[in-house]
Amino acid sequence: MVETHCHAQRHAVRIGEGEGDYANLADAMKTAVMADDADEDTDVVVYDNSERLLYDMDTYDVDMCVLLSAFGMTNELNRQMIEANPEKFVAAAAPVQTKKRALRGEEAWSWEAAADELDEWLSKDGFVMTGEGIRGDPTRTEPVPWRERKKHLRHVFDVAADHGVPVRWHTGYTSGYGGNHLFHLYPDWQDPTLASQLKAEYPEVPIVFDHGGMQAGWREDYVDKVTQVAGTFDDVYLEIGLYWGELMKKPINDPNIAIDQLLWGSDWGASMVQHSQPNEYPPTYWEQISSKGLPAHQPDYWGANQRQLLKFALDTDL
């Protein structure tokens, strides 16, 4: 069993009174510093949480995890985890330092620099794809027209084609973050069917839809769109680890989507909680719930998601 969507780094944050909500912390985490490089003035650090991850892997019989960086998590720390446990971990490469330099005002964002950073990390052992998702200039606040955005995405697809690796394409979103959501800025985050254009242009590059269109909440429109693309290309893959049992039927019952296009990718290490509403549809789903605040514990993604797989298996007599 392989978990294809795992955040094995964790943040420690110094916050003031009233600052501990999703919106404030999301911005603070983007420039996080590795714990070993921090000093007394550092407000946010990321640290290796792989000991907890390995414990969960043993508990739930998970054989390998794909490590992803997000919110200031670094390629460097993922590489250290791979070197310590090469039989357990591989990782996706992201232009983390290019983004941080832009956020700190040290160097303007450029897609050429982002592509160079991706190329550097994909040249190292253990880095097997790009992602999570395809971001962009972190200082931008106005929407990007698709014609312009498509040119940007080609930088990532060119590097992926050179290295023979998949590109991860983000689909779905959580509630709770303040300011401009990425799906407001980027048309490809708004409409996953645009991936078909890049897939046709780069037939040799597989695409993995992060979250399979269902990162959080109960809205299924992104799921419908990603299954449309996966039904057209046999090397487009869907992560269904956050699906509830009934939702799994959509891709599994589609005769144009093969079972090997479905990946068990949840969001291990993220801050969503499982919302339960018995006798409603869906009976349970993942979400960030602002009124309840940040969870005081690390949510158990695998136990809950394996139960949904078991529910589907029992319902369909597998």
What does each model-found stretch correspond to?
Residues 5-11, 170, 211:
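Histidine-centered divalent metal-coordination motifs
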Residues 64, 72-178, 236-237:
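Active-site gating/metal-coordination segments in enzymes
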Residues 5, 57, 121, 160, ...:
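Conserved, mostly hydrophobic/aromatic
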Residues 2-4, 11-64, 256-261, 271-318:
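Mid-to-C-terminal alpha-helical segments outside catalytic/metal-binding sites
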Residues 143-264:
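Catalytic pocket-lining loop regions of alpha/beta-barrel enzymes
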Residues 2-4, 67-68, 92-94, 131, ...:
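Active-site neighborhood of phospho(di)ester-bond hydrolases with catalytic His/Asp-centered motifs
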Residues 46-52, 74-76, 108-116, 149-153, ...:
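Well-ordered, non-membrane alpha-helical segments in soluble/globular domains
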Residues 43-47, 67-76, 98-112, 138-147, ...:
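Acidic-and-aromatic substrate-binding clefts and catalytic sites of carbohydrate-active enzymes
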